[in-house]
Regions:
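Bacterial N-terminal signal peptides
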Residues: 9-19
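N-terminal low-complexity, intrinsically disordered patches enriched in charged
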Residues: 18, 35-36, 136
Length: 220
């Protein structure tokens, strides 16, 4: 019961994080570094390698339902990372959609916690989206967007909550996950980030999807 109350508090906290973010030259990694999802289903996207290349034909009003449909318990972590990256960029176009998506993803996690059976995948999704929204807000705050994009970018304030702690808890519930270690490395700094990346690399089989994503990330 204590554990359930603790997680409920984490998910509902509204205090803003005041720490200065890591501002890598290539931009915040959860937003600016596309992930290779392999053959898994992902949200529609434009062609080309650019990080900010949404499909102009996509109906953003469908974002919450489409994203929840893709965030199944069976979906691999790397596919969820790319879907949540794309979802964050789409959500930046419409503040109502952004709030709706975050609320829906948090509700899934909170529901599992309230039921006394915290779901690792739901907690990961919630933590990852919180940190993605934070990094998206950092991009606007620190003038990292081209003027036309900045004018349309509505994710300007950080959401409350500590998404990183939810990802760490998700890893514990999952019994360890190299893919989640990789994700955690992209939302932490210094020694913590390096340790997450080291553990992910140690567990990544040669030629695996994780190995490819680690190699891609090393270029930034």
């Amino acid at each position: 019961m204590v554990q359930t109350r603790s997680f409920t508090g984490v998910l509902l906290v509204v205090a803003l994080t005041l720490a200065v973010p890591r501002l890598a030259e290539a931009g915040p990694p959860l937003i600016c570094h596309p992930f290779d999802p392999g053959s898994q289903a992902v949200l529609p996207w434009g062609s080309g390698p650019a990080w900010n290349n949404p499909d102009n034909r996509y109906d953003v009003q469908q974002l919450t339902s489409d994203t929840l449909r893709l965030l199944t318990r069976e979906a691999p972590v790397l596919a969820r990372m790319e879907n949540l990256r794309r979802a964050t960029i789409y959500a930046a176009q419409d503040p109502r959609v952004a709030n709706e998506l975050l609320s829906a993803v948090l509700a899934r996690a909170l529901s599992s916690v309230s039921a006394g059976a915290p779901d690792a995948q739901a907690l990961f999704n919630a933590g990852y989206l919180i940190e993605s929204y934070k990094q998206a807000a950092h991009m606007h705050r620190y003038s990292m967007l081209a003027p036309p994009t900045a004018a349309r970018w509505t994710l300007r304030s950080e959401p409350g909550g500590n998404g990183y702690s939810l990802v760490i808890r998700a890893m514990s519930l999952a019994g360890g996950s190299a893919d989640m270690e990789f994700a955690a490395s992209l939302m932490s700094e210094g020694t913590a980030s390096a340790n997450h990346r080291r553990r992910a690399a140690a567990a990544a089989a040669q030629g695996s999807l994780l190995a490819r994503n680690l190699q891609n990330a090393s270029r930034y």
